[in-house]
Amino acid sequence: MRIADYSVTKAVLERHGFTFKKSFGQNFLTDTNILQKIVDTAEIDDQVNVIEIGPGIGALTEFLAERAAQVMTFEIDHRLVPILADTLRDFDNVTVVNEDILKVDLAQHIQNFKNPDLPIKVVANLPYYITTPILMHLIESGIPFSEFVVMMQKEVADRISAQPNTKAYGSLSIAVQYYMTAKVAFIVPRTVFVPAPNVDSAILKMVRRPEPAVAVEDENFFFKVSKASFTHRRKTLWNNLTGYFGKTEEVKDKLTKALDQAGLSPSVRGEALSLAEFAGLADALKGQGL
C-alpha cells in the first residue's frame, strides 16, 4: 500500500486528526499512477538530489525517496511535520524542513545534502495560491537547479509555456523562458485530489538553459519592459510603453527611435513579440536613455 492510496491517506488524516487549511492551499494527491509518472518525467535516480515543496503527508515524497540520492522537503504547516515523521519513517534519505520556502536560506540548506555536488532537481505539487512567487524565487535564486518538474494549475502552466501570438503568452512566459525551456508534460484531473480543487492541474517540465535564451544589456530592465508591454493586453506596444515611460515629447521621440532601431511597429501588441524581439527592444530603449 502507498501513502497516496485513498484508504491510506484517509486513515493517516483520521489518525492524526488533521483538518485542511484553505490558507495553505492543501490538496493531497491520491493517484499512484500519476505520482509514478511525475517521478518518471523528472528522471529521478540515485545520482540526483531533490528539493520538494509542500509534501503534504508525503505521497510524492515516498516515490522520490525510493529513487533519489536524497530528498529535502519544505513544509510550512507545522502540523504536518509529525505526520511526515510517521509516513516516511522507513526512509533515511529524507529531510523535512518546517520553513517557508520563500524565506529560507536555501543555499545554506543545500550544503546539508550528503553530496551537495550532485545535480539538484525541484519536484513538487506546488500550492496554487503561491505558485508563481515560488517558481520565480527558485529560478532567480542563483542556485543551479538542473530542472523543475512541478504540478500547478493548468492555466498557469499554459501561461508559462506559451508561445508568442497566443492568448496565454505574457510577461510570465518571458520571465521563465528566459532562463528555462518549459513544456506541459501531462494534465492531471481535479478528481484525483483530496479535497478536489476547482480546476485541473498540469505537470510542467522546465529545464535550465546553459545560458539565458537571449543576451541583454540589463536583465532587470528587460523584464520591466516586457512586463510593461503587457499592462493592457488589448493596447498597442506604443500605448503600453508611453503609459510606463511617460508621454512627454522627449519620451515619445526616444520611443520612436528605439522602436525603429528594434524594427518594430508602434501598433504591434506585446503578445506578438518573441524573446529576441523583446531583448532588441529593451536594449534599444536603454540605448535611448529610457
Curated annotation (Swiss-Prot):
It is found in: Cytoplasm. Keywords: Cytoplasm, Methyltransferase, RNA-binding, rRNA processing, S-adenosyl-L-methionine, Transferase. It catalyses: adenosine(1518)/adenosine(1519) in 16S rRNA + 4 S-adenosyl-L-methionine = N(6)-dimethyladenosine(1518)/N(6)-dimethyladenosine(1519) in 16S rRNA + 4 S-adenosyl-L-homocysteine + 4 H(+). One of its GO terms (molecular function) is RNA binding. GO terms for cellular component: cytosol. Its EC number is 2.1.1.182. InterPro entries: KsgA/Erm, rRNA_Ade_diMease-like_C, rRNA_Ade_Mease_Trfase_CS, rRNA_Ade_methylase_Trfase_N, rRNA_adenine_dimethylase, SAM-dependent_MTases_sf. S-adenosyl-L-methionine binds at residues 27, 29, 54, 75, 100, 125. PANTHER family: DIMETHYLADENOSINE TRANSFERASE, DIMETHYLADENOSINE TRANSFERASE-RELATED. Specifically dimethylates two adjacent adenosines (A1518 and A1519) in the loop of a conserved hairpin near the 3'-end of 16S rRNA in the 30S particle. May play a critical role in biogenesis of 30S subunits. Belongs to the class I-like SAM-binding methyltransferase superfamily. rRNA adenine N(6)-methyltransferase family. RsmA subfamily. This is Ribosomal RNA small subunit methyltransferase A. It comes from Streptococcus pneumoniae (strain CGSP14).
